C-alpha cells in the first residue's frame, strides 16, 4: 500500500502487464449488447446465465489489461487505504452502458443517474444493498434509466484503458445528428434557429449580470477582480464605522 510502489510491481490475476512493452497485446474489436439495461450478448454470443457473460467479459477485457485502477479510498473506519484493483469485465460493460446512457437520456436525467449511482455505490460498500434507501435508489434507476438502455456498442480495445468507441446503435437514441446539422439540405435546425436560441440564452446572461452588479454594490464581491464572492465581516464593518 506504499505510495512509492506503482502498478508495475503487481502480477495481474485477471489481466496482463499492459505497461510492459515486451507483452504483445493486439488490438481487438468487441460488441456489447444490452436489453433494458441488462447485458445479454458479447460479439453476438448469448450466454446461459449472467455469470458466464461476466466471465467472458473478464477474459476479453483482461487480454488488454482493461479496468486496472490505482485507488486511494476512504474505508468505513474513516481511515484511508490504497490498493490496485482489477475489473476488466465490469470496465468493459460500464464503457458500453455509459455510451448508451448518454445517447438515450437527457442531461438532467443523466445528472440524477450519476448522483443516485454514487449514493447506491456507497450503500453497497457499507453492506446496505437491501436496506430501504438502497431499494428506493435501485427501483428509480432500473425503472426510469435502465429500462430504456437497449442497443449495441462496438469498441476497439488496445492496451490498458486505451480504447476507442467505433459504433453505437439503438432504436432509443435521442441523439440524432440530422437534427443538428446546419448544412444545406433538409433539416429541422437552421442557423436562424441557433441565433434565436442564443438570443434567449442572452436574456439569462443579462439577468446574471444585473445580479453581479447588485453583489458589487452590497460589497459581496469586488468589481476589481474575478475572485470568489466574499461575505463581509460584520465585526470589521462595526470597527470601520467607529
Swiss-Prot record:
InterPro entries, alphabetized: Arginosuc_syn_C, Arginosuc_synth, AS_cat/multimer_dom_body, AS_multimer_C_tail
One GO-annotated biological process of the protein: urea cycle
Top EC group: ligase
Chief location: cytoplasm
Gene Ontology molecular function, alphabetical: argininosuccinate synthase activity; ATP binding; protein homodimerization activity
Keyword line: Amino-acid biosynthesis, Arginine biosynthesis, ATP-binding, Cytoplasm, Ligase, Nucleotide-binding
Assembly notes: Homotetramer.
Family the entry assigns: Belongs to the argininosuccinate synthase family. Type 2 subfamily.
The protein's name: Argininosuccinate synthase
